[in-house]
Amino acid sequence: MAESTVTADSKLTSSDTRRRIWAIVGASSGNLVEWFDFYVYSFCSLYFAHIFFPSGNTTTQLLQTAGVFAAGFLMRPIGGWLFGRIADKHGRKKSMLLSVCMMCFGSLVIACLPGYETIGTWAPALLLLARLFQGLSVGGEYGTSATYMSEVAVEGRKGFYASFQYVTLIGGQLLALLVVVVLQHTMEDAALREWGWRIPFALGAVLAVVALWLRRQLDETSQQETRALKEAGSLKGLWRNRRAFIMVLGFTAAGSLCFYTFTTYMQKYLVNTAGMHANVASGIMTAALFVFMLIQPLIGALSDKIGRRTSMLCFGSLAAIFTVPILSALQNVSSPYAAFGLVMCALLIVSFYTSISGILKAEMFPAQVRALGVGLSYAVANAIFGGSAEYVALSLKSIGMETAFFWYVTLMAVVAFLVSLMLHRKGKGMRL
C-alpha cells in the first residue's frame, strides 16, 4: 500500500488545507493526552502522597513524591533517543502511536496501584516504575510531535501552527488541573485522599484510546528517501549537527526550568509559601493556565514576523530581570487577584519560549535527524533542569533557603539569553 505523505508548501488547495488541519488536530490530541496523564501526577500528589509513602510531615511526603516526579524525567533522554530514532528511521506516525500506548499503560498502573499499607515498599517502587514508563513515553512524544507539527505547517505561518504543540501541552496540564478542581468541589476531602485521586489517572487512560484512533488517521510527513539514508536517526548523524544540539540544550534548560516553576510547582508554592488554601491556589492556576494557553498562537504568529531569535532574546532578558521580583512578591501575596496577575506576568514572559519551542528546534536540524535532534536535546535539558525544579525548590525551602531558588532560575535565564544571541537571524540558516 502506498504511503500517504504531506509536506509544507505555501501553495495549498482546499483539500491540502483540510488535511493539514486534521494533521494538527490528530497530533495535538495525542499530545494533550500525553501531557494530561503526566501532569495529573503533579496535581494529585497533594492527595496521594500519604498513600504510597510512610507517615511523616507533609513537606517530607511531598518531597518524596517530587523525587518520583523528577525520576520520571530521567527516562526522557532515553525516550528522546529511542522514539527520535524510530521517527527518523521508520516515520513520525509510528513513533507517535507507540508513545500514546505507553502513556496509557503507565496511567492504568497508577490508577490501580495499592498503597503502602497494603503492599509495603512495593507501593513506592511500582509507582516509580510507572512514572519511569511515562517518562520514557513523554521523552519520545515531545521531539516527534514537535517535528511533525513543524513539518506539516505552512511556510510563513510555521510559528503560528507549531505553537499548537504547547497549546495542547498546556491544555493537557489545564485539563488535569480542571479535573482536580471539579473533584475538589464534588467530593469530600477524605474521599479524595482515599480513592478519588485515582479517577484522573483512569480518565487519562480512556482519553488515550481516543487519541490513538485519531493518530491512526494521520499522514506521514517524512519522506521514504530521507528515512532510507544511512545516517537517518543515528547518533553519528546527530554529531554532525552538534552545534545545534548544544544550543538547544542551553535555551531548553532555562525554558523548561521557568515553565515548570510557574506551572506545576506554582500551585504548591501558593499553598506552602503564600499560605493560600489548596482550592484557591488551584482556581488561580486554572485561570492562569487557560489564558496562558490562549496566548500561545498569538506569540507564535508574532515570531513569524519578528523571528525566533528576537522572541528568544525577549524571553531570556525578561525572565532574567523579573523572576526574582515576581517570586518575591508572591511570597507575601494575600489577594487571589494579585496572585493571578503576578503569575500571568511570569507566564507571558515564558510564552516567548513556549510558543516557538518546537519550531525553533526543528528548524535547526536536517530532516534525517530532526526528531532525534529535537527530542534528545530537549529531553536531556528537561530531565536535568525541568524535572528537578520542584525537588530543588522544596529542598531549598526545607533548609530555609527558598530565595536561592529564585536566583537559580534567574541565572539560567541569563544562559538562555546568551545562547539566543548565537541563533541565526530571521530567514537565515533554517532547515524547514
UniProtKB/Swiss-Prot annotation:
Which residues face the membrane's Periplasmic side? 54-62, 117-118, 184-193, 265-279, 331-339, 395-402
Any GO molecular function: solute:monoatomic cation symporter activity
Name one cellular component (GO) term: plasma membrane
- Does the UniProt entry include the keyword Membrane? yes
Query: What protein name applies here?
Result: Alpha-ketoglutarate permease
* Domain of life where this protein originates: Bacteria
Topology versus the membrane: Multi-pass membrane protein
What SUPFAM superfamilies does the annotation carry?
Answer: MFS general substrate transporter (SSF103473)
Q: Which NCBIfam families match?
A: 2A0106, PRK10406.1
Species: Escherichia coli (strain K12)
Gene name as annotated: kgtP
Pfam families reported for this sequence: MFS_1 (PF07690)
Which PANTHER family would you find in this protein's record?
A: ALPHA-KETOGLUTARATE PERMEASE
Q: What does this protein do?
A: Uptake of alpha-ketoglutarate across the boundary membrane with the concomitant import of a cation (symport system).
Q: Which family does it belong to?
A: Belongs to the major facilitator superfamily. Metabolite:H+ Symporter (MHS) family (TC 2.A.1.6) family.
Which sequence ranges are listed under topological domain Cytoplasmic? 1-32, 84-95, 140-162, 215-243, 301-309, 361-373, 424-432
**Keywords in alphabetical order:** Cell inner membrane, Cell membrane, Membrane, Symport, Transmembrane, Transmembrane helix, Transport
Q: What is the protein's major site of localization?
A: membrane
Q: Is Oxidoreductase given among the entry's keywords?
A: no
The record's InterPro entries line, in alphabetical order, gives: H+-coupled_symporters (IPR051084), MFS (IPR011701), MFS_dom (IPR020846), MFS_trans_sf (IPR036259), MHS_symport (IPR004736), Sugar_transporter_CS (IPR005829)
- Residue ranges spanning the membrane: these are 33-53, 63-83, 96-116, 119-139, 163-183, 194-214, 244-264, 280-300, 310-330, 340-360, 374-394, 403-423
